[in-house]
Design a protein with these regions (language model features):
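Short amphipathic alpha-helical segments
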Residues: 263, 343, 402-406
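Short glycine-rich or small-residue beta-strand-to-loop segments that form or flank ligand, phosphate
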Residues: 67, 252, 405-409
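Conserved PLP-enzyme active-site core in the AAT-like
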Residues: 2-33, 37-39, 43-55, 60, ...
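Conserved small-domain helix->loop->beta segment predominantly found in fold-type I
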Residues: 290-368, 372-400, 436-446, 467
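Short, conserved charged micro-motifs
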Residues: 275-276, 354-362, 411-420
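Short beta-strand-to-loop capping motifs
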Residues: 269, 347-350, 408-410
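PLP-dependent enzyme catalytic core of the Aspartate aminotransferase-like
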Residues: 385-468
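A common structural junction motif
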Residues: 285-287, 374-376, 425-433
């Protein structure tokens, strides 16, 4: 196991408040055992998400001071537009305040009721935005993605045979576009190979159907291609990114991930008619096309972050730090999804807590226990987030994977803090039988994991109060 060395120095620090187990237990009760409802100041190591939680560089902070807050024609927009075009290569660049608005603008424009949108695996907001248009969000990732022990290098690949079967069954007129999520967040942060993307493009050209990328972790995906795919080891990540996006017709992007910013996103595409319709809607719901719901200073920080994220020293450390956590857990026998992903380590809750059935939310129970005992906040990626109700029987259809995602913010935590996370999980695993399941007491009609509330089925106990 290689100890990853940080390619940066720390200039500004933020104190972290330590809490006791008793405090955290009270906070969990008040939050209905939903970690989204726990105040961030009461979290010691926050691995809920890597979205919008990264540390910006001094270069990005300097860019904030150059913000041009003109309503129309901000110079920061033109800089941002040039950077996006230089990396992604698409004709139209439409800024949004974050990725889900880019999804909303795209799907509300091109997706109609009764249509279907294939993807390797949709993430939560992507799926919700498709279904909000009364369309079907189809997950067509390769079957190996659902085997947490399978160590294929590109487990995010779309199943081309199933994609072709879907097109023939539904008809190309019912498929306005195909999405490809890079990296595949809901499948463990797994990358998609260039060969799979190229072959997807060739398949779709026969109909023709547009290909769009959910590009929020594009740099990490391209780094995996450089590491793992023959023929790319000597190519710069920027060159790999340009080739990857050349096979698509557009992309949505939450820049809160690989844009290294706290807010911002964009939609970029080639189709003139779609771009005009989307821009008209943008003006109605987000703002003028040269700011898209963002301040000029945020556009500047985003432009600079998109350049910085392609630095290979940074990417080597970024992927290496995530791998470091995963390898510490794996060596101790903690069940995780393999291979280790690009932005997060995923605990396999089915194997961690085999005594808790999926109907009692084992991944959520594990996330609750990790926060209660150690002040570490992860997020459930399982029955709560992706469970469905069968419209005929009314029974819950459980997802194949039941995981807790530990998403590591970029350039935020030291390796000592990552080691603390590993040691805490290892200790919790040794007394995992003390963790009990949860019962749902409230759920919203969509994206329920953000606001759901639970009751514990039995009081959870700890070997000793832990203050962190």
């Amino acid at each position: 196991m290689k100890f990853p060395s940080e390619p940066f120095k720390i200039k500004v620090v933020e104190p972290i408040r330590r809490t006791t187990r008793q405090e955290r237990d009270r906070l969990l009760r008040e939050a209905g055992y939903n970690l989204f409802q726990v105040p961030a100041e009461s979290v010691y190591v926050d691995l809920l998400t890597d979205s919008g939680t990264s540390a910006m560089s001094d270069h990005q902070w300097a860019g904030l001071m150059m913000g041009d807050e003109s309503y129309a024609g901000s110079k920061n927009y033109y800089h941002f537009e040039a950077i996006v075009r230089s990396i992604f290569g698409y004709k139209h660049v439409i800024p949004t305040h974050q990725g889900r608005m880019a999804e909303n603008l795209l799907f509300s424009t091109v997706v109609k009721p009764g249509m279907c949108v294939p993807n390797n695996i949709h993430f939560d907001t992507t799926r919700a935005n498709v279904e909000h248009q009364q369309a079907e969000a189809l997950d067509l990732v390769i079957k190996e993605a659902y085997d947490p022990h399978c160590e294929l290098p590109f487990k995010g690949n779309i199943d081309l045979a199933r994609l072709e079967e879907t097109i023939n069954r539904a008809g190309p007129d019912r498929i306005p576009l195909v999405m490809m999520t890079i990296t595949n967040n809901s499948g463990g942060g797994q990358p998609v190979s260039m060969e799979n993307i190229r072959r997807t493009r060739e398949l779709l050209d026969r109909y023709p159907i547009p290909l769009f990328f959910d590009a929020c972790r594009f740099a990490e995906n391209c780094f995996f291609i450089k590491e793992r795919e023959p023929g790319y080891a000597e190519k710069p990540v920027l060159e790999i990114a340009r080739e990857l996006f050349s096979y698509g017709d557009g992309c949505t992007m939450s820049a809160k991930k690989d844009g290294l910013v706290n807010i911002g996103g964009f939609l970029s595409l080639n189709d003139d008619r779609w771009a005009q319709e989307i821009t008209n809607m943008l003006i109605l719901v987000e703002g003028f096309p040269t700011y898209g719901g963002l301040a000029g200073r945020d556009l500047e920080a985003m432009a600079r972050g998109l350049q910085e994220v392609l630095d290979e020293d940074y990417l080597s450390f970024r992927v290496g730090q995530v791998r470091y956590l995963g390898e510490l857990l794996e060596q101790a026998g903690v069940p995780i999804l393999k291979p280790i992903g690009g932005h997060a380590v995923y605990l396999n809750a089915k194997e961690f807590l085999p005594h808790i059935p999926q109907s009692n939310f084992p991944a959520q129970a594990l996330a609750v226990a990790l926060y209660r005992d150690y002040g570490i906040r992860g997020v459930e990626i399982g029955t709560l987030m992706f469970g469905k109700t069968d419209p005929v029987t009314g029974r819950t259809i459980h997802p194949e994977l039941e995981m807790v995602r530990l998403a590591i913010p970029r350039r935020v935590y030291t390796n000592m803090q990552i080691t603390y996370v590993a040691e805490s999980i290892i200790e919790l695993y040794r007394r995992r039988e003390l963790i009990h399941g949860l019962a749902l007491t409230y759920e919203a009609p969509m994206l329920r994991h953000f606001t759901a509330r639970f009751a514990e089925l039995q009081e959870s106990s700890s070997l000793e109060p832990t203050a962190v």
